[in-house]
C-alpha cells in the first residue's frame, strides 16, 4: 500500500501522519510546537467532544477567531465527526456574521 492510498478522506491525513511520522513537527505557532501524533490525538479529542455535544453528521460548526494552529485541529475534528466547519472572518461586521450564522 502506498502512502497516498492510505489517505481517502480528509480525516485520514492526521491519522496517517500520526502513524508514519509521529514525532515530526506538524505545526509551529508562536511558542507552541505540535507533532503529528499530538495533532491526531487533539483532533480525535475535538471529534469526540463534538459528538458528546450532540453535533450530528453534516451539522455546521462555526469558528471565528484570529489565526491559530488550533483551527486545524478543529478542521480535522469536524472531518472525523462528519460535521462541517464554517470559518468566519473575525474582521466581519456584526450584520455580516449574523447573515452567515443565519444562512
Set out the residue ranges of the language-model regions.
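Conserved AMP-binding/adenylate-forming
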Residues: 32, 47-95
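N-lobe entry segment of adenylate-forming
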Residues: 1-34, 38-53, 57
